[in-house]
Curated annotation (Swiss-Prot):
GO terms for molecular function: ATP binding; proline-tRNA ligase activity. It holds the Pfam family tRNA-synt_2b. PANTHER family: BIFUNCTIONAL GLUTAMATE_PROLINE--TRNA LIGASE, PROLYL-TRNA SYNTHETASE. It is found in: Cytoplasm. It comes from the Bacteria. One of its GO terms (biological process) is prolyl-tRNA aminoacylation. Catalyzes the attachment of proline to tRNA(Pro) in a two-step reaction: proline is first activated by ATP to form Pro-AMP and then transferred to the acceptor end of tRNA(Pro). It comes from Flavobacterium psychrophilum (strain ATCC 49511 / DSM 21280 / CIP 103535 / JIP02/86). The gene is proS. Keywords: Aminoacyl-tRNA synthetase, ATP-binding, Cytoplasm, Ligase, Nucleotide-binding, Protein biosynthesis. Consists of three domains: the N-terminal catalytic domain, the anticodon-binding domain and the C-terminal extension. This is Proline--tRNA ligase. InterPro entries: aa-tRNA-synt_IIb, aa-tRNA-synth_II, aa-tRNA-synth_II/BPL/LPL, Anticodon-bd, Anticodon-bd_dom_sf, Pro-tRNA-ligase_IIa_arc-type, Pro-tRNA_ligase_II_C, Pro-tRNA_synth_II.
Length: 492
């Protein structure tokens, strides 16, 4: 099996696009800007879903489902949110087709089936959910209300890329209501921390926790918390956001509760979400010129066993050994595949599973039967070693944990060596052009300066890091006083 991938050094963007398709993760569809997530790619998303869903439930959230369609009048109730998403909305105006009298066999929109009110295909669900919460919340005893939804949303993107930016994508969106400002802020921070925990412990991706600037903040939020990751090409990727909504949506939809004294108050809200964009982050953080590199905690197949044989007798003996290994792996919840296809040679199988990023490969041939050994190959380092049969399951279990840890350490080292402090704009432009990564610089706090820097360099403020140190300085662009550094980068 010839991989022949474009290398990252040749063309990083082309490498990514080829890899997503060649590794059977996803492909473009017949609908502009929409993708087909293939079974192998969806299996990774399912593992992500399962872990996140567990984490949400452990923090007290329940799943629900709300309509795909939002009446236009409802959508525009919270003005900032409506304005922020207006240019990306798909709109349903009619509810029926009919045969076209001028074109036999063709259909046309029935002009008599116009909706009284247009329906927006949800780009996000705050409007429909908060209009529902009005009927669910009457008293402080109904709070907090902690709801999550797994759904698809539509944002009519003009420039699309598989997983990173598509017109339709899968995601989860949490929407919570609280009795106090303090509780809502704590919820926003908690969910940012849940996302960071997931990124680091399952995706093996180090992230920076921070706050978005006013310009980058979610439309309709008072504060947006985020986690920012760095890809191998030195570009940042926003991996998750958690918004403190204040009382904006509660006031827009008149969601009130009677407090302990019987007085009516508006509730306080949050919303938070991650999407299939995480799939793109996973691919770009760890993969190499040979294909995918998957962290064991999210790999659909953690171990693949490839038999090498010439006779039916050898194949039967290897199969018996492999099936014994499989039953032992399953007891440890290690997902394993025995690639016993007789239509492909071992070399083809090695290349295929390398391309698909399976963390560990076990090869068993006639010599291994004779010597009671196995050849073990690591996908992340491409190293091989021969190990005795005795204790092999425990060894591989430990090896998977080591690979998970090593992938995180490698990504962390890359990230940390690509955070550069600069003091003036000329230095900023040089680092951005020649090195990339996060650039730590003083900023005067104004949207005007932020916009001008973006216009000149295409770099944006990714976040105001929560762990930044207090440091008075001067804005690298205007020279005005600054109270602390922020992180700039070019981004996906």
């Amino acid at each position: 099996m010839s991989k022949n991938l474009t290398t990252r050094a040749e063309d990083y963007s082309k490498w990514y696009n080829e890899l997503v398709v060649r590794a059977d993760l996803a492909e473009n569809s017949g609908v502009r800007g929409c993708m087909v997530i293939k079974p192998y790619g969806y299996a990774i998303w399912e593992k992500m879903q399962a872990e996140l869903d567990r984490m949400f439930k452990e923090t007290g959230h329940s799943n629900a489902y709300f309509p795909l369609f939002v009446p236009k009048s409802m959508f525009e109730a919270e003005e900032k949110n409506a304005e922020g998403f207006a240019k990306e909305c798909a709109i349903v105006t009619h509810y029926r087709l009919k045969n076209d009298p001028d074109k036999p066999g063709k259909l046309m929109v029935d002009p008599n089936a116009k909706l009284e009110e247009e329906l927006i295909v949800r780009p996000t669900s705050e409007a429909i959910i908060w209009s529902t919460y009005k009927g669910w919340i009457q008293s402080y005893r109904d709070l907090p209300l902690l709801i999550n939804q797994w759904a698809n949303v539509v944002r009519w993107e003009m420039r699309t890329r598989l997983f990173l930016r598509t017109a339709e994508f899968l995601w989860q969106e949490g929407h919570t209501a609280h009795a106090t400002r303090k509780e809502a802020i704590e919820e926003s921070e908690k969910m940012m921390n849940v996302y960071a925990d997931f990124a680091q412990n399952f995706m093996a991706i180090p992230v920076i926790k921070g706050l978005k600037t006013e310009t980058e903040r979610f439309a309709g939020a008072e504060e947006t918390y985020c986690i920012e990751a760095l890809m191998q090409d030195g570009k940042a990727l926003q991996a998750g956001t958690s918004h403190f909504l204040g009382q904006n949506f509660a006031k827009a939809f008149d969601v009130k509760f009677a407090n302990a004294e019987g007085k009516q108050e508006h509730v306080w809200g949050t919303s938070w979400g991650v999407s299939t964009r995480l799939m793109g982050a996973l691919v770009m953080t760890h993969s190499d010129d040979n294909g995918l590199v998957l962290p064991p905690n999210l790999a659909p197949i953690q171990v693949v066993i490839v038999p090498i044989f010439k006779t039916d007798e050898e194949f039967e003996k290897i199969s018996a050994l492999a099936n014994d290994l499989i039953s032992q792996f399953k007891k440890l919840n290690i997902s394993v595949k025995f690639d016993n296809r007789t239509t492909q040679k071992p070399g083809f199988k090695f290349a295929e599973w390398e391309l698909k990023g399976v963390p560990v490969r076990i090869a068993i041939g006639p010599k291994d039967l004779e010597n009671e050994t196995f050849e073990i190959a690591r996908r992340d380092t491409l190293t091989k070693e021969v190990k005795p049969k005795e204790g092999i399951v425990k060894y591989i279990s430990d090896l998977l944990a080591q690979i998970q840890s090593d992938l995180f350490s490698k990504a962390l080292q890359y990230r940390d060596t690509h955070i550069t402090e600069v003091s003036d704009f000329e230095e900023f432009k040089k680092v951005l052009e020649n090195k990339g990564g996060f650039i730590s610089a003083h900023w005067d706090g104004t949207p005007e300066t932020e916009e001008k820097i973006k216009e000149l360099t295409k770099a944006t403020i990714r976040c105001i890091a929560l762990n930044r140190k207090e440091e008075i300085g001067n804005c690298m662009f205007t020279g005005k006083q600054s109270v602390g550094r922020v992180l700039f980068a070019k981004a996906y």
